Amino acid sequence: MNWNTKQENVPKPPPYSKTQSSILQHFLMTSTTSQSSFNYSPHNQEASQTSFNYSLHNQEACMYSGNSNSVSQPLLSGRNYITPQTQISVSNMPTRTIVASQSSMERVVSTNGKGPQQPNHNLQTVSSGIMQNVWLPSHTEATISHNPDGGTNMPYMHPPQNQLVTSDTYSMQLQMAPLHSGKVPMTHQGSQGLNHFIPDQLVDWTQYTSNELSYPEYRPPPKQYSYILPATTSLQVKNNQLPTYTQSLQSKHSVPLSSHQYAAEASKRLSALPYSCRYENQHVQNAQPVSKHLPMEVPQSSEVHSSEKKKDTYRGFKQQWQNPNEKVSIGQFSEVKINIKQPYSESVRPSGDGVQALVQNNQEKRKYTYNPNTNQVIDTNATKEKLVRDIKSLVEIKKKFSELARKIKINKSLLMAAGCSKTANTSYTEPIQHSEFSAKEMSAKNGNDCSMELLATCLSLWKNQPSKTTEENVPKPLEEKQCNTSRISTTVVGSANPTNEVHVKSLCSGVGNSQKMMSSSQTVLPVLIPSCESSGVAVGKGTELQIAVVSPLVLSDTNTLPGKDSVPEVLPETLYPVVKEGSVCSLQTQPTETVALPFDVIGAVASNNISAEIPLPVDKEKQHKPIQGDPDIADSSLGKHSPLGTEVLPKPMDSTIVSGPMLQIESICSLAEGDVSYNSQIAEIFNSVQTEPQKPSPNQVIDSQQEQVYDTTENKDFSLQKDKCVQCTDVPHEVPEQPEPLQPEEPASSEYVEANREATEESCREYTGRKESTAKDVCLPAAIQQDPHPRETDMFSKSDHSLPAINEINDESEPISYLHDQLSELLKEFPYGIETFNRHEVSLDQQKTHKIVENQTGGKTSNVSGDSTDQIKITVLNSEQIKELFPEDDQPCDKLAEPENKEIVAEVKSPCDSQIPREESHDLGMLDPEKDKIHCCALGWLSMVYEGVPQCHCSSTEKKEKDQCLDINSSKQGEQPCNSGITIFEINPVSNNSKTPLTQATEEGHFSAVHGEKTKASKTKDNREGQELACHFSAKCYKKDKKGNFKIRHDTSLKMEQKLKNISSKCDIPNPSKCNKIAAPEILHVTTSNSAKNMPFSKQASQESLQKKHTSQDLGPVKAPIELSSNTDPCRSNTSSVQSVSPEKKKLKFKAGGSRLKYFEKRKTDHVIIPDVEIKKKKYEKQEQNKNAGDTLKLCSILTESNERASVQEKTVPSPESSDPKGSSSKSTRVITVQEYLQRQKDKQITGNNASRNICVETVLCDSGHTKTSKHSAAVSWGKLVEGQSISAETAKELEHNSSSHGKDFKIHHSEASRTHSVSNNNKGKFDGKQPDKMFKNKTSMNNESNQMPLQVKEQRKQYLNRVAFKCTERESICLTKLDSASKKLSIEKKSGEYTSKTKDTDKPSMLEFKLCPDVLLKNTSTVDKQDCPGPGPEKEQAPVQVSGIKSTKEDWLKCIPTRTKMPESSQRDSADSRLSKRSLSADEFEILQNPVKESNIMFRTYKKMYLEKRSRSLGSSPVK
C-alpha cells in the first residue's frame, strides 16, 4: 500500500524531485523559498541525501518520506501547498512554513534534527492539516508523535517523532507536539519549508532555523534545528486552515506515520518511506514512539484522506496557500503558535539574523495566526525574501564550496597522481623511490582516477590558459611549488629512474607510466603534470601547470614510448591516445633528453624515430649501461629528474633505459617546468640537495638519455660542455650565466639545469659522439629524442660512421612520424594536446638556441654545440626564455637578432643574398634564439596562450625540422637558419651552396656548405650544428621522404641529397644572387617545408624544379627536370628544392604569415619588419629583374596569405612529413600552424582576408595571366605531385607553387586564395599575365615532375597532411581554418583528383583558374571558401563537407566547368557542418581525414554525423552541467 500510494505519489515525486532542484533554485531565487525549500530539499534528500544528512540526519529520511508524501499529494501541490506553506510560513517561516503545511511532510522532517524526517513531518503535516497543527504543537510541545508523521522517516527524525505524522486531527498532533517539543523540537513544519530548502542551500542555517522553531531542548541538536521552525507556525496555521487539506495531507502524511504504526495509512505513508526508507533504520526508533502516539489518529484522516485528499491537498493547498483557508485551524494554530513562540524566540537566538527575523515574523504571524493569513503572507513574503536571499547566498556558498572542494579534490588527485611528490621535496631518495612506485601505482590508480576528468580539466585549463602563464607564473611560485611537484612529478615520471635498480621496472614505470599516462592519461599525467609545466612546454596554471606538465611528460612518455620498440611497442599505442599530453611531452622530453633517457634508450630515439628505437635503445643501453654503473650516470638519470637526485642515482643506473622514459618525462618537467617549476626544483635540488649534481643533473639528464651516460661520468667535461652549451645558448641570454647561478638561483638554476641538461645532453651527445662510435648511437637517440637535429648534429660529428645510426635514426624518424600521426590522432581526441608540437619545438628551439649560441660563440665543437643546441634549445625556450626570456630574452633576441641580422645582411649583402641573408642571417644569428623564445617562449607562449602549448614546440620542432632542412638548405644557402631555428647557424646562404660539395661526404658536404656559409657568417659552430642537424634532418628526410631514392635511403640518401643539394647549389651557384634568392625561398620553403619534411619534400621537389627552373630560367629549364628527378626523391627534393627555392621560399615563407622569418620580423617589429620590407622590396626589384625574383616577391605576398595557409597546412600537413620525421613534422606542423596562425591573424587583422587577397593580387601581378593558364594545371599537377609526395595537396601546392614557379605558387595559392578569395583570383588573373608563359612552363614542367613523385611519399604525406590540416583548422580556428580549409581542400582535392590531375596536367590552367569555384565558394562564405575552394581535387575528400554533386563538381573543377553552384550549396551546408565538426570534432575529423575519403558522400555523412553528435553532446551536456 505504501509503495502503491507512494507510486501514486512517485510520479509526482520524480517530477517534484526533478522540479525540486529547479523549484528549489527557483524558489530560492523567488520569495517562495519555503516552497522552493520543500521542493528542493525533498529532491535534495532524494538526490543529495548526504548533504541533508550532513545538516539534518533525520531530515534525510524524513525528507524522503516527506518527499514521498508531498509528492504523493502535494507533489503537484508541492508547489501549490508549498505556496500554502508559504502562507503558513507567513506566520512561522513563510518560505518554509508553507512547505511545512503541505510540503511540510518533506520539509518539516528535514527540519527536524534529521534532515529527511522533519520534511516528512511537514509532508505529513502538509498531508493533513492536523499534521501541520500537530507539527506546531509538536514543535511547541516536543511531541514524539510528530515524528510519526515522518514515521517512516522518523528513524532519523528522532525528535520529530511527533504525532505530526498523524494526519488525524489537530488534537492528536497537538498531543504529539508536546511530546515533540519536550523531546525533540519537532518544529519541522515551520522549519521544514526552511529546512528543506535550506538543507539544499545551507543545512546549517536551516538547522539554526529549526532550532529557533525547535524548542530550546531541541536547539542543542542542530541537525533538527536546521529546519526553520517558523514553518511550524505556518504549518499550524495551514493545519488549522486545512481540514480537508490536513486530511489529504494526513493521508499523505499518514504514509510516513504508517511506517510507525499506521495501518492502512501506514502503507500510504510508506509511499513516502521509499525516500525515508534509507533513513528508516534511524527513524524506526522514533517511529515506534510516534506510532504509539499517532496510531489512533493518523489512520483515520491519513487513510481516509490519503486517496481522497491527494487531489484535495493539491487543490486545498493551492487554495489555502492562495487563500487564508487556515481559519478552521486558527484556534488550534494559535495555541500552537503560542507554544511555538517561546521555542521560536529561543530558536531565533540560535538561528541567526535571518532566522531570527523569520522567527520574529513567525512569532508575529503566530500572534496573528488566528486571523492573519494575510499577515502570515506578509510575514511570509518578508521571510521568503530573507530566506530566498539566504538560500541564494547559501546556494552560492555551496556552489563555491563544492567548486573549491572539487578543485581541492582535483589538486589532491593530481598531487596523489604526482604521488609522494610532497615528500619528494624534502627527501629525494625516499620521494623518488616512493614517487617512482607511487608514480607507477598512482599512475595506474590516480591516472585512471583522474585520467578522464582530470585530463579533461587539465586540457581545458591548458587550452584556456596558455603555458605561457603557467611558465611565467610557474617559474617563480610554481617553480618552487612545482619544484616539489616537479620533483614528485619528475620522480613519478622518472620514477623509473629511482626504480632504475629494477631496470625493467623503471622501464615499466617510465614506459609503463607512459602507457598509463597515455592510457589513463592521468596515471602518470598527474605526476607528469608538474613535470610538463616545469618543462615550460605549455602548461596552464597551478593545477593546470600540472596538467600542462602532464601533457609534455605524457608526450615524452608517449612519443618516447612509441619509439620504444621493446617495452613501448604496446605502450606507444596505449600512450598515443593520450598524445595530447604525450605530444608535448615527447617533443619536449626529447629536447629534455635527460628525462627522456630511458625513452631515449628505448623510446627516446623511438619517440622521435621509432625505427631507431631498436638499434638506439641497444646503443643507449650499451652506453647507458656502462654509465649506469657510474654514479654520475645514475646522477644524470636522476639528474634528468632532478627530484630524484643522486641519492636514487644508483637505481637509474640499474635501468637507464627504464629511467630514460621516466627521466624523459621528468626532463620535460625540469625543462618545461624546469624553466617554470621543475627547473627551479632542479636548481633547488641541485643547489640545496645536489649542488654538485646540479651540473651532473643536467649532465645526468643527458646521461639519462643514455647517450650522454658516458659524458655524465665525465661530469667535469660534461659540466664544461654544459656551460658551453648554456653559454652557447645565447637565445636564453640568461642561460649562459646559468651555469654558475644555476645552483644559487632556483629559477635560473632550473633553467640552467634545463639548459645544462640540454646543453649537457647535446654536449654529452656530441661529446659521446666524439668519444665513441657507440656514442653516435647514443647521440643519435638523444638527437632522436630531442628531434632529428641532435642526432644530425651527432651524425655530423661522426657522419662517416654515424650514417648507419642516422639511417636508424631516420627510420626512427618514421616512428616519430607515426608518433606525430598518433599525436594527430590524439589531438583529435585532445585538440589542445597540441603540446606534442610544442615539445618538439622546444627541443628544436633549444637546438636552435644552442646552435645560435654556438654560432655566436663560434668556438664550440660541433658535437658540443649540436648537443647543447638541442638541449639548450629546450633550456633556452623552456627555462628562462619561457619565464624570463619570453618577454626579455625574446626582445633581447630580437635586438641581438636585429644587430646580427643587420650584420649578416651587411655581410651577405648581395642582390638576392643580402636580402635573404638579412632575413635569414638575422634569423640565423639571433632570430633563431629569438624564434626559440618567440616560438618556445614568446611564440610558443603565444601559441600556448592562443591554443595550448603546441606553438613553442611546434616552432621548435618546425625549426628543428626546418633547421635540419635549412641546414641542408644552408649548405646551399646559409640564410635558411634565420627562417628555421636551427638555420641560425646557416646564416650565409651563398657560401652554403658553394660549400655543399666540400662536405658532400653525406650530409656533411651539405653541412660543410652550411658550415661554409656560416663560416662566411662567422658562425662556424652554428655551421657544424647546422650541418649536424641538417645531416640528421637530411638523413631523416632522405630516409623517409627520399622514397624516390630509397637505394641510398640513409647514407646514400644523404649523399644523394647532398649531391642534389650540391647540384642545386651548383645550379643555384651559377647565379649567386639567384642561388641566394632561391635559397631564401628554399629556406622559407624549408621553414614550412622542413616543418613538414615529407610535404616540404614534394613542395621542395616542386620548389627544386621551380628553383632549378628559376635557375634554369637563368641557367636553363633543363635543370627543373634534373631537380625533379631528385625531386622524386623527397629527401633530395627537399635538399635541392631547399637549395633552389630557398631564397625565394625563404622570403615568401618568411613573408608568409606562417613563415618564421615573417613571424620573427613581426616579432622583431621594426628591424625584422624592415628587413622583411627590404627583402620584399629587393625581392620586388629582383622580381622585376628576374621572373624568379618577381615570382618570389609575388610568392612573398601570396605566401603571406597562401603560404600562411600553405605553411599552416605545411605545418598542419607535416603529418605526411611526420611519417618520416613525424615528431618533427608534427611539431613543425603545429609550430608553423601557430606561428602562421598568429601571422595570419596579424596579416588578416592588418589587411584582413581581403587585404591578403589584395596582397596576393598585387604580388601576383606578374603571375596573373599565367595563373589563369597554368593555375589549374599547376594546381592539378602539383596536387598530383603533392599526392605523390603524400603532402597535403593544398599545402604542397602552395609550397610547390611557391617554389616550383612562384607564379604557379601564386596561382595555386591564389587558386586557394581565390577559392577562398575570389577577388584575389580575379586580380590574380590580371596580374599574373605579366609572365604567364615562362611561369606556366616552369609550373607545368615542375608539376609534371612533381606528379612523378613516388606514390609512397604521396600517400604517406597525404594521410598525415589531412589530419594535420584538420588539426591546423581546429587549432587555428577561424582564420587559419579558412586558409587551412582551402589548402586542405586543395590537398584533398588533389588527392581525390590525383589521377585526374595527372591526366589533366595540361588541363590544369583552367583548373588553376579557381575563380569560378572561389566565387561560388566565396558566396558560401568561409566555410564554402574553405571546403569548396579546393574544389578541383579535394572535393572527394572534402565530400564530408560537400556531399551533393561533389564528384560531378570535382569533374567540373577539373574541367573548369562552373557547375559548382550545386556543390557550393551542399558544400555551404556541408562545409559549415564539416568545418564546425572540424573545430569541434577534431578527433573524429582527424581520423576521417587521416584516412583518405572513401567517398564524398560517405565522408560528408561521417562529418555531419560526427558534427551533429558532437553538437548534441555539447548541447545536451551544457544544460546538465
Swiss-Prot record:
Pfam families: DUF4617 (PF15395)
Modified residues (Phosphothreonine): 996
Residue stretches of biased makeup (Polar residues): 1093-1105, 1124-1142
Localization annotation: Nucleus
Biological function: Plays a role in the regulation of imprinted gene expression, regulates repressive epigenetic modifications associated with SETDB1. Required for the recruitment or accumulation of SETDB1 to the endogenous retroviruses (ERVs) and maintenance of repressive chromatin configuration, contributing to a subset of the SETDB1-dependent ERV silencing in embryonic stem cells.
Subunit structure: Interacts with SETDB1.
PANTHER family: RETROELEMENT SILENCING FACTOR 1
Protein name, UniProt field: Retroelement silencing factor 1
Species per Swiss-Prot/TrEMBL record: Mus musculus (Mouse)
Gene that this polypeptide is encoded by: Resf1
